[in-house]
Amino acid sequence: EAGVDLIIVEMMRDIENAKLVIKAALSVGLPVWIGYSAMMSENRKSVHAWYWKNKLPTSGFDELVESISTLGGDAAGIMHSQVRDTAPALEILDRYWSGPKLAYAETGELEKPDWNFKEICSPEEYATEIESWINNYGVQIVGGCCGTGPEHIRILKDRLPRYLPG
């Protein structure tokens, strides 16, 4: 039977907007997966909610996740974030979210004007990172975001079966 099976809300990075979006998604009655976007500060000492380079962050990532996680949902995690920023963000998510976790990071940088992606994380490196997210943070839902190509997914297919139940 055709139809919608779940709702995924992505780039939750602003407390006020995220609350509105998540409450609306939950009101539908379908499972809801919540994707937070995060980035490290320039000095790499703290995690911020993702923001455009020409605007300041509206909240710290810790504050965002703490405020939003109480709303519920069926899975939550980190997406549309740099690979190197994902583990620190998962560490914060782990403090406030005990449900199933997801993670899918950007593996490339956009080169304008033709929407080509320059690889910033090889397929092998990405698979290794995902394995660490599974082992260290209990991530159960994985994938790829900007720049992810067929080779990234092929290697995941080859390396992830060891994490599947019996």
For the regions a language model picked out, list residue spans one by one.
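Domain-level signal for soluble alpha/beta catalytic cores
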Residues: E1-G166
